[in-house]
């Protein structure tokens, strides 16, 4: 039993180290970004790297042939959270992160098939994994009125980017516990 426990702890430690290691090289960033979306989105998607300064230029890592753009983990974040974005969501996100009010004329969609980490109240520091999800932005914030605001219950919920008020809808499509149980 002691030997089994040692093996399990070693495997768990190795998994924790590998899953929290953020991509560094361009090849790692491309691979990380492409796992954010389903294959029909990511296989032909453009891959960008995050700007080196807020509001700066995104760096092209790979030119794609469809309208989707995928980005790797955000530098400086404590977790690996790659995403794939349609042109509307990408524009909305780039404007929001640069401190500009986004102006979009239709719904935008994003995939985060690797999931994301959230704190329940936005400030407690207690984080949990949201699991794979789709996000939707709308030109009309009223579209999100009445939606759940609790990201911990597995239901669709509304959220906003740090230091911003523009809302987006997060729709988990698989519970994290279910995903771990099947691996």
Question: What are the residue ranges of the model-derived segments?
Answer:
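Primary mode marks residue(s) on the alpha4-beta5-alpha5 output face of response regulator receiver
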Residues: 18-183
């Amino acid at each position: 039993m002691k030997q089994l426990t040692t093996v399990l702890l070693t495997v768990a430690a190795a998994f924790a180290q590998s899953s929290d290691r953020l991509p560094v090289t361009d090849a790692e960033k491309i691979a990380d970004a492409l796992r954010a979306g389903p294959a029909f989105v990511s296989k032909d998607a453009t891959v960008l790297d995050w700007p080196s300064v807020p509001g700066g230029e995104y760096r092209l890592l790979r030119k794609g042939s469809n309208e989707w753009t995928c980005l790797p983990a955000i530098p400086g974040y404590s977790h690996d959270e790659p995403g794939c974005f349609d042109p509307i969501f990408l524009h909305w996100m780039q404007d929001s992160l640069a401190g500009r009010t986004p102006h979009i004329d239709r719904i935008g969609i994003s995939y985060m098939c690797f999931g994301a980490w959230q704190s329940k109240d936005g400030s407690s520091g207690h984080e949990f994994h949201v699991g794979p999800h789709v996000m939707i932005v709308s030109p009309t914030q009223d579209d999100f009125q009445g939606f759940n605001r609790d990201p911990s219950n597995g239901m669709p919920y509304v959220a906003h980017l740090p230091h911003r008020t523009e809302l987006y809808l997060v729709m988990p499509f698989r519970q994290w516990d279910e995903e771990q149980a099947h691996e």
